[in-house]
Amino acid sequence: MSGLFVSFEGVDGVGKTTQVERLRAYLEAQGRTVVVTREPGGTVLGKAIRQLLLHGVDGGAVDIAPRAEALLFAADRAQHVAETIRPALERGEVVITDRYLDSSLAYQAGGRELTPEEIRSLSMWATNNLLPDRTYLLDMDPALSHNRLEHAEDRMESAGSDFQSRTRQAFLDLAAAEPNRFHVIDASQSIEQVWSAIEADIQTLLRDNVADVDTVMARSGASTGAVTMGGVR
């Protein structure tokens, strides 16, 4: 794949949607084709699953068992990768997703107290081992981010302060375990300060991505040349 895959993570209210749109505009201004998507709900199937996950069955408050919840997220993600993410990457496009598998690891393994090994194994199977090139973790105290919410709470957002605190810590633990993929940004800063940190990092990431593609093409050309010369001989 020659595309670029970027995900945004963090507890609710940290400003992911705002920064996703800033990044989209920035990349499109540079002539890149950008696909913006989200989890759950990035496909038609995903929208139906999102309704169940965030609002319950028929909008009711019946709780979903942790294992059932994890399987629903995995089903959404499997369809998301197959239908939207992987095809776009294969076309050489940039994919930006508002949440990906790290949300499952943080919310289900951290917040819901399932084991990280269970959730990671399920998520990697569902995505056929597809990980983002960069994950921006917008970090903020949930007590502060909660005050930013401008809509009625969904099932996840109303889970309580202890759940949100465990989820935040789970995100930070994930970032510490994969420092080459994660870029942690203090989301309590202004929108412009957060964007400046993302902009500086994405410039480096784009340069590295172009260099990697050039290397692959050079190797491919050398290999093709060797075959041609062999045929002449």
Curated annotation (Swiss-Prot):
Catalyses which reaction(s): dTMP + ATP = dTDP + ADP
Binding sites annotated in the UniProt record for ATP: 10-17
GO molecular function: ATP binding; dTMP kinase activity
Signal peptide per UniProt: none
Matching SUPFAM superfamilies: P-loop containing nucleoside triphosphate hydrolases
Keyword Kinase on entry: yes
GO cellular component: cytosol
Alphabetized UniProt keyword annotations: ATP-binding, Kinase, Nucleotide biosynthesis, Nucleotide-binding, Transferase
Annotated InterPro entries: P-loop_NTPase, Thymidylate_kin-like_dom, Thymidylate_kin_CS, Thymidylate_kinase
Pfam family, one: Thymidylate_kin
GO terms for biological process, alphabetical: dTDP biosynthetic process; dTTP biosynthetic process; dUDP biosynthetic process
Enzyme nomenclature, EC number: 2.7.4.9
The protein's role, per its UniProt record: Phosphorylation of dTMP to form dTDP in both de novo and salvage pathways of dTTP synthesis.
PANTHER family: THYMIDYLATE KINASE (PTHR10344), UMP-CMP KINASE 2, MITOCHONDRIAL (PTHR10344:SF4)
Stored HAMAP family: Thymidylate_kinase
Name of this chain's protein: Thymidylate kinase
Organism: Bifidobacterium longum subsp. infantis (strain ATCC 15697 / DSM 20088 / JCM 1222 / NCTC 11817 / S12)
